């Protein structure tokens, strides 16, 4: 089996890792960092930038620089949380034909999985560069509280990126895997408190050693898929906007460029206030009016930041209480608390966690890397490289069907582990029906209409019978990715029908295939751009070395040779400015050809007279010793 990488596809940052020789390796990207900003930018010339390069140009290209897109994945445009984000991001969130929340870039509508695929491609390339071989398979993590639509959309992103997603696993579970394989000895019950860039999860996980095998059992999970570091940033941005308006009378919210600068400043200030008690935000020329340019200068203390976000931190407590209740465990029985996600570096978060669970959280688990490391371990389990790990996860939300009277009948409760084939019997609502509609739901409400509809299908061609007589057995089966398979069988006739519940808010097969083709086209364009850049670099280097050689040769070059070389130089420089790789290569060859006799002549002369050849080098060394001026510090001794 091919090697399976682990990818943490985060809201703010993403990370990729691999298990090598029994150890998990977090792989550095091309920029030399172990995490990559989950930011994608679409340049006017069609180039797609991902990661740090996208982040660097965000201020000058705010409308086409996308961040925190994971918050939109599997979401409907009309949802309150989406409407809230529309007010805060500089890019355009639009309504797709199927009602999904999509993004518009350069006049083109794009689905969140299509955008997330660009990050996955970057992670895939990072792994391939390190391993020196093609990578096609991955384990990708998602928030534990992601619903079926969001999980399916994440798998779609993998397909668009040409990644075979072997497994979708929950982020807290992945973090526990990393912790359990490295830190835990013996039986442990741990809390994984995961406050990331866009989502919050908490899981109660039991780690046991059974006959030499590490067994990870998720007892319960809870969370909020729209609570994370981005919300903390928004509070800071609002504060800066308010302070600036109070000072200047100007509202920055209608200025996308200013808002992008504020976004970066808020993120930076938040990070600084985790290690210092005060910081200053200084943004010159943030805007201008008739009186001239305006500058934003705001001092903010850690206590002020904490007062701005205290309610957000408090919002994490209710899911913690619910997770403990669902697991049937008292907080005093928790052995360790593991913090995951960059936002957990905030002192207020750590203080609250310590107070609630009555113990200090562990500091020896990297909150930015633990999830990707756990995904890599799961990948190694699937590949057969790790044989002593058993992972038992839970369904994050109750799954059921609509019964008579619009009541939801639960088939799989949210607390137990994934239970395959849990049957329930349904009957017909109306007299003499020859078909029964199966309506699949996800949620915790008793009223069917208040839960999320995952899909509908009909069991047709059953004998007409009075209301309540037909006996339809409905079976739910959750696969290892948390994707739901539903079957229905008429007990009288044996007639069967089954479907895989895919995100009804997700992409159609045709859309996914088109996006895969688009990604392949982009990949080909990227390859051509890389080859063109390489040809340009080769041409530039040859121009530089040839001009230096002509200067060093002096009168040893004939006028005829100099004219020919100069003409070839001009032709190559012109070709470098263009986009024709073949033309550049042809001009490189032409310049190499006309300059070769001069190079050979100079080489021969150097071989005959090495002392003369050394003189220019000595002169250059002397020239290097020349300084523009000398300064001496004179101290006043008193």
Swiss-Prot record:
One of its GO terms (molecular function) is ATP-dependent protein folding chaperone. This is Chaperone protein DnaK. Residues 605-615 have a biased composition (Low complexity). It comes from the Bacteria. Pfam families: HSP70. InterPro entries: ATPase_NBD, Chaperone_DnaK, Heat_shock_70_CS, HSP70_C_sf, HSP70_peptide-bd_sf, Hsp_70_fam. Induction: By stress conditions e.g. heat shock. Keywords: ATP-binding, Chaperone, Nucleotide-binding, Phosphoprotein, Stress response. The keyword Ion transport does not apply. PROSITE patterns: HSP70_1, HSP70_2, HSP70_3. The modification Phosphothreonine is found at residue 199. Residues 605-624 are annotated as: Disordered. The gene is dnaK. It comes from Pseudomonas savastanoi pv. glycinea. Gene3D superfamilies: 1.20.1270.10, 3.30.420.40, Actin, Chain A, domain 4 (3.90.640.10), Substrate Binding Domain Of DNAk, Chain A, domain 1 (2.60.34.10). Acts as a chaperone. Belongs to the heat shock protein 70 family.
């Amino acid at each position: 089996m091919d090697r399976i990488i682990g990818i943490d596809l985060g809201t703010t940052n993403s990370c990729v890792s691999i298990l090598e020789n029994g150890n998990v390796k977090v792989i550095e990207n091309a920029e030399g960092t172990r995490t990559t900003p989950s930011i994608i930018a679409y340049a006017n010339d069609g180039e797609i930038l991902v990661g740090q390069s996208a982040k660097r140009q965000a201020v000058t290209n705010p409308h086409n620089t996308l961040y925190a897109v994971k918050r939109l994945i599997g979401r409907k445009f009309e949802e309150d949380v989406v409407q809230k984000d529309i007010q805060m991001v500089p890019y355009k969130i639009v309504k797709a034909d199927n009602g999904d929340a999509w993004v518009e870039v350069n006049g083109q509508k794009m689905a969140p999985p299509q955008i997330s695929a660009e990050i996955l491609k970057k992670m895939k390339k990072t792994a391939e560069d390190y391993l020196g071989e093609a990578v096609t398979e991955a384990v990708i993590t998602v928030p534990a509280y992601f619903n079926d639509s969001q999980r399916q959309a994440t798998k779609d992103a993998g397909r668009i990126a040409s990644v075979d997603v072997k497994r979708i696993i929950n982020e807290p579970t992945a973090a526990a895997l990393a912790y359990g394989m490295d830190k835990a000895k013996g039986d442990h019950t741990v809390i994984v408190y995961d406050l990331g860039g866009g989502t919050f999860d908490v899981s109660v996980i039991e780690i046991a050693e059974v006959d030499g095998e590490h067994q990870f059992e998720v007892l319960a999970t809870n969370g909020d898929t729209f609570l994370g570091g981005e919300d903390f940033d928004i509070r800071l941005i609002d504060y800066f906007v308010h302070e600036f308006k109070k000072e200047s009378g100007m509202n920055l919210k209608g200025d996308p460029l200013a808002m992008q600068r504020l976004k970066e400043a808020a993120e930076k200030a938040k990070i600084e206030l985790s290690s210092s008690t005060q910081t200053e935000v200084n943004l010159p020329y943030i805007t201008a009016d008739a009186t001239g340019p305006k500058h934003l200068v705001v001092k903010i203390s850690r206590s002020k930041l904490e007062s701005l976000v205290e309610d957000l931190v408090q919002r994490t407590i209710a899911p913690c209480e619910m997770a403990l209740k669902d697991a049937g465990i008292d907080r005093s029985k928790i052995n360790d608390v593991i913090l995951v996600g960059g936002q957990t570096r905030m002192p207020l978060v750590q203080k609250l966690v310590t107070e609630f669970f009555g113990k200090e959280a562990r500091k020896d688990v990297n909150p930015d890397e633990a999830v990707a490391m756990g995904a890599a371990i799961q990948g190694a389990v699937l590949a057969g490289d790790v044989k002593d790990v058993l992972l038992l996860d839970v369904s994050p939300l109750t799954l059921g069907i609509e019964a008579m009277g619009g009541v939801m009948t639960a088939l799989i409760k949210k607390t137990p582990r994934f239970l395959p084939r849990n049957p329930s019997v349904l009957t017909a609502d109306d007299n003499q029906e020859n078909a029964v509609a199966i309506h699949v739901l996800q949620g915790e409400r008793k009223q069917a209409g208040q839960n999320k509809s995952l899909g509908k299908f009909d069991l047709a061609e059953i004998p007409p019978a009075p209301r309540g007589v037909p006996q339809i057995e409905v079976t739910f089966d959750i696969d290892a990715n948390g994707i739901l398979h539903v079957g229905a069988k008429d007990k009288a006739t044996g007639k069967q029908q089954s479907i895989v519940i895919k995100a009804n808010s997700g992409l159609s097969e045709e859309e996914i295939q088109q996006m895969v083709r688009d990604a392949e086209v982009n990949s080909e364009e990227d390859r051509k751009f890389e080859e063109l850049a390489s040809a340009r670099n080769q041409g530039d280097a040859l121009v530089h070395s040839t001009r230096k050689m002509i200067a060093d040769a002096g009168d040893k070059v004939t006028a005829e040779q100099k004219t020919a070389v100069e003409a070839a130089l001009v032709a190559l420089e012109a070709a470098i400015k263009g986009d024709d790789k073949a033309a550049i290569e042809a001009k490189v060859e032409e310049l190499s050809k006309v300059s070769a006799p001069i190079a050979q002549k100079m080489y021969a002369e150097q071989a005959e007279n090495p002392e003369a050849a050394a003189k220019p080098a000595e002169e250059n060394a002397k020239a290097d010793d020349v300084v523009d001026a000398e300064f001496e510090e004179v101290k006043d001794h008193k």
